[in-house]
A protein has these predicted regions:
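Bacterial N-terminal signal peptides
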Residues: 8-22
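N-terminal secretory signal peptides that target proteins for export/translocation
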Residues: 1-5
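Extended, histidine- and acidic-residue-enriched regions that form the cofactor-binding/catalytic faces
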Residues: 26-145, 149-261
Length: 261
């Protein structure tokens, strides 16, 4: 953009922002992005929760391409909905719990070549998680349970490193709840400290797995957030049906993975 136009755009944005900050217009009522999470609590309420032995729950997702029919935040919607259900179950069992706002700047190697896929360096994510764990410990939490909605192996390895660091430092008892097929890919085993393996056995995966933005994820989004699914284009979409050797190329990501998709 030529300099005068760029200056005009900058000035226009700054002016608009100043006006909005001075007198924000009323907005239509809609669910808060912080609904059900620690962010809506006061510090007094949080202190009371930790004194009552509350456990912390944390969903770790990513902003990532999910085909032409699902939103970039698919991997955030799903684990958030799962933890909201977990909260309800824990409430029924009289277990005190606090849910953190979902993390969504993930490590994105597999789909990183697509527009909208935000890729964070693993060490940056690990350091951020380490700081969050330390802050939770200072707030009085003794345990935190993490889940992911984003199955990129590099993303999970960043989580694994953060969990191990927290447990070595004894800042907080950190736990990563991992589906068995993902745990197998990551080399995790039952009994590994800090890791809880759940779900079907690793060898239960079909020869042509429903990897990404397919029937499983689409069904989940239709169940928890139907308004964000572009249902009108779904009938025109064909599954990729990748063979095992193609899946390996896909998992390596970047341009080869994009082409095979």
């Amino acid at each position: 953009i030529e300099r005068p136009r760029k200056f005009a755009l900058t000035l226009g944005f700054a002016t608009a922002l100043a006006l909005c900050m001075a007198a924000p217009a009323p907005v239509a009522s809609s669910p808060s992005v912080f609904a059900g999470t620690m962010a809506e609590m006061t510090y007094i309420e949080l202190e009371a929760a930790t004194r009552n032995g509350a456990v912390a729950l944390w969903a770790l997702g990513a902003i990532e391409e999910h085909g032409p029919h699902l939103p970039l935040a698919t991997d955030v919607y799903v684990p958030t909905a799962q933890l909201l259900q977990v909260q309800q179950r824990l409430a029924q069992q009289k277990i005190s719990r606090v849910m953190l706002r979902a993390y969504y700047w993930g490590v994105n190697r597999v789909r990183g070549s697509f527009s909208g896929s935000i890729d964070i360096r693993p060490e940056v994510m690990t350091e951020l998680m380490t700081d969050v764990f330390r802050s939770l410990s200072k707030a009085g939490f003794k345990q935190v349970f993490c889940i992911t909605g984003h199955y990129d192996a590099a993303h999970s390895r960043a989580i694994i490193e953060a969990v191990r660091r927290a447990n070595r430092a004894a800042d907080i008892e950190a736990n990563y709840v991992v589906p068995n097929p993902l745990a197998f890919r990551l080399g995790l085993k039952v009994g590994d400290a800090g890791f809880i393996l759940v779900g079907p056995p690793a060898n239960a995966a079909p020869a042509r797995p429903d990897l990404h933005a397919g029937q499983a994820q689409t069904s989940l989004l239709l169940s928890i957030a139907p308004d964000v699914v572009r249902s009108e284009i779904m009938p025109s979409l064909k599954p990729t049906d990748l063979m095992p050797e193609e899946v390996e190329v896909w998992r390596n990501g970047y341009e080869p993975g994009k082409r095979i998709t």
